[in-house]
């Protein structure tokens, strides 16, 4: 990676954190006015996602000399975020224009499309090959982690959902989200166990952190929705 690309990535990282901090500060300032906070959240969400989409498609364009797999990976992640943006736009229209509860709704179709596309994008990222012994060790460790997390998800999230008094569609979609988060978690673990070229470390660290944040916020949202506290 040349100096120009390093500076560009550094500036992009600074900009991303500046936007995140600004969003958090404004949300805190609007905490006393639930309606304004809702409007702010519904409007800024798609705007931020459009910036992310532009960045991912630019990454695909800039990596055209690094192989087709790299380009496909960035394109898939860009398409994944495009579906998220469509979901947020649909959510905003339902909530602000029609004053209806957007969950469950058609917005969930777009949100759910994000998970397999994003996980597939991670899969297409080029990585160095492991030795046979390392590969078996990694498979065993990943299996243990996924089994443990799967049991925890069943005990604390999936099983309570199945006995919840909420409508069937709400429970069904909530369980699908949990399962897809599990798919995303698998992609994250695979990302952590992969050996990438040094030039990919920075962007992939940000992607990994974003995946962790998404999984955590998803679970908080599901719990609040099912408990009626959202």
Across the structure, where does each feature detected by a protein language model lie?
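Polytopic alpha-helical membrane-helix bundles and their juxtamembrane interface segments
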Residues: 1-230
